[in-house]
Amino acid sequence: MSGESGQPEAGPSHAGLDWPNPERNRAGVPGGVIRRAGSQGPRSWIQKVLEQIMDSPRQCVTPSEVVPVTVLAVQRYLLEDEPRDTVPKPPLYCYDVTISDGVYQEKCYLDPSLNSLVYQNILKVGIQMRISRVSCLYNEKRIGQGILCIDNVHCGETSDSISLETPFRNRAHQEKPERPLRGGKSHYLALWNNEDPYGDIWLTDKQPEEHNFSDTKIISLSHLEMTWTNRRNFPALLVRILHKSKLRYYGKPDKKMIEPYQTFLEVADSSGTVSVIMWNALCPEWYKSLRVGLVLLLQDYSVKKSYPFRIQPVPVDPQIKLISTMEICLNLRDPPTNIIIIPEKQVKPEWRLPKLNHRFTTRSELDDMPENCICDVIGLLVFVGRVQRSKKKENREDFWSYRWIHIADGTSEQPFIVELFSTSQPEIFENIYPMAYFVCTQLKVVRNDNQVPKLLYLTTTNESGVFITGHRGQPYTYDAKVKNFIQWIRTKSDSGEQKNMVIGGYYPYPPVPETFSKYSSSIKVESLLTAISEVRKEIEDLQYREQKRIAIQGIITAIKYIPHSSATESASASETLRNANRPSTSQAARVEIQERNGKRHQDDEPVNSQYFQTTSTNLSLSNKIRILQGPHANPVAVPQPGASVQTKGIKPGMPSIFNRRANINANLQGKARKTISDRWESQLWREKKFGLIDHLHYSRVYPESIPRKFMFEHRKFLSDQYNSQPAKYVPPEGRPPKLDDFKSARSLGHFEVTILGLNHEIAIDVAFLPMYCPEDIRTSQIDTLLTSMNYSCAYPQDTTGNDRLPGPRAVAGDIIKAATELDRVHIVGILDICNLGNNKVEVYLHKIYSPENTS
């Protein structure tokens, strides 16, 4: 897709031009006065634009030639207020965009009027774009650095061939550490959140060093608590790290802090535990080198009264005194703190430093754990959702990054469901995939037993940490529950487990309650209901991977079933490579389903009542379709593409509506098939659809919305698809497959649902993506559309024996029949909306409340 934008006629500032000299030796130079280039060597478009700006007195020009350039980096930073700003502005994040014309690279400043292209992930790395207006501005805090400003741009498609070998025209742009083009900040931020350390200012090479304690005076924490108010100089502290928080970025435009970071450490000695706050420039120097369990010697610190509203984490040992009256502060200066990591081999027993006590919980124990209880878990990742974002505060530019994961530990049929927020460990958060052994600490239990389905999941806290590699040698490996998990893993085979692994896609968790009144009391928003006339703005205001849940009122007037297309049911990438000369299993399954379902070619007319009666009759109560309802339901049973899917009660060879249709259409064999579809539309819709003032079309299902069967050999590609867009271009490994090459973990296809506003003036088309499984006696009866449109979990299991599921067409018939029963009924629809980037938005119907369950 492409995006086009451009607001200002001139750049943000105008100043005399004094560009660094871009010599034509493909090496770049550090500075000087620009010179006209000779005719030798390849001609650089960037060079020509700079020469054109030099000749323009307004310093804002339209290039004489507009050619595509490649985007190699999009980097974000906070720009402080200008001196003329008397009223502090909200955070204004700026973007530097590195482009290449094939001859040179150039780091450019993106005019803030174009920031929305980054917010929507339209301007991103790897694409070609055409810059149609540029200007010049200077960083007045640095000598002789003229900056090329992008004022108008047209974003194109992803480039097929990208080279990273072209040099920077200006050598200053490749100096380390990287610095933003404007302002006084020394570093870039992560592109999509403020919690992750990003860039080369974050050091990782701090090593333990032996220390001679003969001349070191050490004070205990309890003694320091009693005497700190009467001291000017504090003796050293010898402590062990028990908890480490994620980073907090507190930068604001009106604050002049160079590196405004903060992190908390909970440390302890034999006398107590206390909070340690690491400030500012110490965070980039030390944060990534410090880990839970290390022993530290702290010298030249400061002490202050503790912040009264901060809640300290639960102590790892309840016998240790919790010191909450003071805090230890570590700074680069005033005074300059000295931190030493003590090697574990030098730690003496007489120091009596506390050991780490993990609180590992098994999945079978989770059902009985109270809300807000803190625990650690270990298990096998069986589902890894896409990275999503939620806004921290309305009308702000700050977001949380999170993803949903499922962890199995062998103690229950149910997995742990974990809401995993970024823990300032991007090297792990962005590289998790199914089949990995996963440890997460300091998780909090979230539960609600008073709603249907019951709510039970875990969420990360400020002190949570994740581990995915390097488990050997970690203190938790000696825990009995960890050893039991390792024993369980040894009984599993990789090939047997892989077929049940799922990655990515739309994941509508947590489920909403069974009544609208409970839903109303469970959410915290200013306006409970969104007018259907406001839905378009709600959707357009979403930023990249931002997911929201809104409620609208309306009337369901039409529904249409869309089976899996050939694209979404194609063979997996590895099967395509291995079985190029023979039909794939999924292809065989498609043929079987098409034959069973009668190759319907003439489905534009509404489904008639005979179809509903036949479908309803053939679905016995004991094998009714059930939509999975939250964590207390059985794992989803997804029929394998090659397996026989048969409606109970229909014997092979028995005439059915499907077989009758197949016979009717047999003479059409060899002709192009239309997409099979079943639909219904109400008389009200026929009367109103041509007189609407607006009809919103948001029912398209994109490949990114489909959860996929995980293939270990393509883990890097699949992980990249469901991670956030990177800030810097990374070349793919070999020839990457396409997302549609991987099998869908859903077996039913989807529905297009039309909801007409209560005033009959505006309608919206949305998608509904159910997944079904055999009846679960632990969940309530699900016989109507009202209860089936709820949370569907991507956790597939094989069907065995007599547990075969009815075919997708039978399920679709049941759902469409339920829709007809809502004709002219006022409902409340819960919509999940998410911006997928690049002008793609998903709008999915999560649940509908009828008048019976709105009270």
Swiss-Prot record:
UniProt effect for mutating residue 279 to A: Decreased binding to single-stranded DNA
Compositional bias (Polar residues): 577-588
Alphabetized InterPro entries for the sequence: NA-bd_OB-fold, RADX
Binding region for DNA: 228-331
Annotated coiled-coil segments of the chain: none
Subcellular location: Chromosome
A GO molecular function held by the record: RNA binding
Feature: compositional bias, Basic and acidic residues: 592-604
Xref: SUPFAM superfamilies: Nucleic acid-binding proteins
Source species of the chain: Homo sapiens (Human)
Biological processes, Gene Ontology terms: negative regulation of double-strand break repair via homologous recombination; regulation of DNA repair
A cellular component annotation (GO) from this entry: replication fork
Protein name in the entry: RPA-related protein RADX
Main location: nucleus
Gene3D superfamilies the UniProt entry points to: Nucleic acid-binding proteins
Region (Disordered) residue spans: 1-34, 570-608
Effect of residue 304 to E: Decreased binding to single-stranded DNA
Physiological role: Single-stranded DNA-binding protein recruited to replication forks to maintain genome stability. Prevents fork collapse by antagonizing the accumulation of RAD51 at forks to ensure the proper balance of fork remodeling and protection without interfering with the capacity of cells to complete homologous recombination of double-strand breaks.
Keywords assigned: Chromosome, DNA-binding
